[in-house]
Amino acid sequence: MKVIKTLSIINFFIFVTFNIKNESKYSNTFINNAYNMSIRRSMTESKTPTPTGAGAGASGSAGSGDGASGSASGSASGSASGSAGASGSASGSAGASGSASGSAGAEGSPSTPATTTTTTTTNDAEASTSTSSENPNHNNAKTNPKGNGGVQKPNQANKETQNNSNVQQDSQTKSNVPPTQDADTKSPTAQPEQAENSAPTAEQTESPELQSAPENKGTGQHGHMHGSRNNHPQNTSDSQKECTDGNKENCGAATSLLNNSSNIASINKFVVLISATLVLSFAIFI
């Protein structure tokens, strides 16, 4: 009788401990599922305000791009106007207009000589052509028969010498300027063209990298997804498939129902085992 009593007591404690372990397992899974659901809800709530910030960042970058384009257009127009002025000074008629502007500047300051012309050029070759064309003007101003009677004003001397010096300027510029200088004078205009031609090549070199980047990202994500599926084979249930498909509402409902059914089954087992041990204990003690 004592042996039966001890065995029944041992069985009772064994069943109780076994059921407690099972209950702890199911309770842990239930807690984990609830925690995962709370994390998913927080993630969905945090994802909603992000597109507004991204739109603001995009508008800011667009404003900076407008500023860059404005500076680029300003520099391009400045260089184009400089090259146009240089080419105009090389021609005869444009040289005459340049000397007229110089005479207007001479009227403001009478102490300046008659043939002072302010020309801002970018090439040394153009500067040499302008100085070579100015020297005959000065000589013509001094040897002008109308100027022997008295000292002429700079404006009148320049106006009279312009018509006489147009032909001489054409001949002198053609004789003094070698053919290589024409290429040099055209070089400032060619440099922006070369820069513009080099810009599409840079865009073309960047485009294959941009095209290849999404492919690498896609392959990396593909391998990562396979790795996660291989590492977690228990995610092949119907409820987990619904979770991966994006049905978050069905996902939470299915997992909660499964947990409730498993908990009910474990409780039923625990009640049956307790009742069996109690029946045995009463039978033994009575």
UniProtKB/Swiss-Prot annotation:
Gene Ontology cellular-component terms listed: plasma membrane; side of membrane
Signal peptide: 1-20
Stretches forming Sequence repeats: 59-68, 69-76, 77-86, 88-96, 97-106
InterPro entries hit by this protein: MSA2 (IPR001136)
Source species, domain of life: Eukaryota
Membrane topology: Lipid-anchor; GPI-anchor
Annotated region described as Polymorphic region, given as residue ranges: 44-212
Propeptide intervals in chain numbering: 261-286
Cell location: Cell membrane
Residues carrying sugar: 22, 36, 163, 235, 259-260
Region annotation (Disordered) ranges: 43-248
Low complexity: bias regions: 69-137
Gene Ontology biological-process annotations: cell adhesion
UniProt region (5 X 10 AA tandem repeats of S-G-S-A-[GS]-[GS]-[AD]-G-A), positions on chain: 59-106
Cysteine pairings via disulfide bonds: 243-251
Record comment regarding domains: The N-terminal region appears to be involved in lipid binding.
Summary of the function given for this chain in its UniProt record: May play a role in the merozoite attachment to the erythrocyte.
The protein, known as: Merozoite surface protein 2
